[in-house]
């Protein structure tokens, strides 16, 4: 096998063809190629190498125009307002974000589809979609291969876990979504959940029950509601709070398996010693912690989990003194701004300056 490979690869003609094909695939994978009329696509000479394509016209895609197993990422332009019924097999992502309309009754998904991005104006009760393989059994299944779905800007309708397939792992809710959640709202297979801009709902015990596979949780800009104990699944490893969040972190309100925690620009709450929710007792697995632009609170000994290896203070006016004794024992990276440098480390008898200086990094 190796001998055959070297014989083929040493043939300059074949070698040049291989590299040409690789270059074409690489070039057409970087950005979307925009087509504004059907004739432009027909005349395009490298169709078989296209990976990303934007259909920027208000014309239904003709049947069999696009060969199967070529396009993987298909985006529809802002003028598109037609039924979607003849998409090729092989499409893994459909982006309708900027299209004029989405009629779920005139949309058949390719059986290979993994990611669906809905358009901004879509705000109808989301029902079951069918695929385009004309199989009656499969036509009764909703999004039977889709793993990721992103709702458009205006979507604010009730959702139910039964509309999603068993393969769904990621949901991004719309900026307008403000519906109450319960244990039947979201599919149990989720590993990623992102709330939109306006969501500020009170999460109750049981609302997220069953999401035992959830790993990443992102809150939107407006979220500023206190997190109660036993509400968030312990499976969560990363939480990002939006810019409005400024609530006291109650003991045991954050998942014990949390590894990454990022606060937004408004957060400026005291960080208490144990049983504080940021201490080793509550978050024994926390590795990365980031405070943002408003934070300016003292860091007391044992108030932060000793498991933390990376700690950032991204506030230009953070001026609390820090010492080795107040920082996590496993800390390898401490990020601060240059204008706070002298204030933070000056004249502290508890500081072992040689150790302290090794971990300090100046943020841009």
UniProtKB/Swiss-Prot annotation:
FNIP repeats lie at residues 57-98, 155-198, 214-244, 245-271, 295-340. InterPro entries: FNIP (IPR008615), STK_FNIP-Repeat (IPR051251). The keyword GTP-binding does not apply. Keywords: Repeat. PANTHER family: FNIP REPEAT-CONTAINING PROTEIN, FNIP REPEAT-CONTAINING PROTEIN-RELATED. This is FNIP repeat-containing protein DDB_G0277323. It comes from Dictyostelium discoideum (Social amoeba). The lineage of its organism: Eukaryota, Amoebozoa, Evosea, Eumycetozoa, Dictyostelia.
């Amino acid at each position: 096998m190796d001998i055959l490979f070297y014989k083929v690869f040493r043939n300059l003609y074949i070698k040049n063809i291989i590299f040409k094909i690789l270059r074409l695939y690489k070039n057409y994978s970087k950005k979307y190629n925009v087509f504004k009329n059907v004739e432009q696509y027909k005349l395009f000479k490298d169709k078989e190498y296209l990976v990303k394509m934007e259909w920027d016209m208000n014309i239904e895609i003709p049947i069999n125009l696009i060969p199967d197993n070529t396009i993987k990422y298909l985006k529809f332009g802002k003028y598109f307002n037609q039924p979607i019924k003849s998409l090729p097999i092989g499409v893994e992502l459909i982006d309708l974000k900027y299209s004029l309309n989405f009629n779920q009754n005139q949309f058949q998904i390719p059986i290979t589809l993994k990611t669906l991005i809905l358009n901004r104006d879509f705000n109808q009760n989301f029902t079951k979609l069918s695929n385009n393989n004309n199989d009656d059994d499969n036509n009764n299944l909703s999004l039977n291969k889709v793993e990721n779905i992103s709702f458009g800007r205006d979507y604010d309708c009730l959702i139910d876990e039964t509309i999603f397939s068993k393969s769904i792992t990621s949901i991004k809710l719309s900026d307008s979504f403000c519906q109450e959640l319960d244990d039947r709202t979201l599919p149990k297979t989720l590993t990623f959940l992102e709330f939109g801009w306006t969501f500020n709902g009170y999460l109750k015990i049981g609302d997220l029950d069953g999401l035992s596979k959830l790993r990443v949780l992102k809150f939107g800009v407006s979220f500023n509601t206190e997190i109660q104990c036993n509400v968030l699944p312990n499976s969560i490893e990363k939480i990002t709070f939006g810019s409005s969040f400024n609530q006291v972190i109650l003991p045991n309100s954050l998942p014990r398996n949390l590894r990454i925690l990022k606060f937004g620009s408004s957060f400026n709450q005291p960080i208490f010693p144990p049983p504080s929710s940021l201490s080793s007792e509550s978050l024994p697995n926390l590795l990365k912690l980031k405070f943002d632009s408003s934070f300016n609170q003292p860091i007391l000994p044992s108030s932060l989990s000793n498991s933390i290896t990376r700690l950032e203070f991204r506030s230009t006016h953070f001026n609390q003194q820090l010492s080795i004794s107040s920082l996590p024992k496993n800390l390898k990276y401490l990020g601060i701004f240059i204008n706070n440098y002298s204030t933070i480390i000056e004249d502290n008898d508890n500081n072992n300056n040689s150790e302290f200086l090794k971990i300090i990094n100046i943020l841009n």
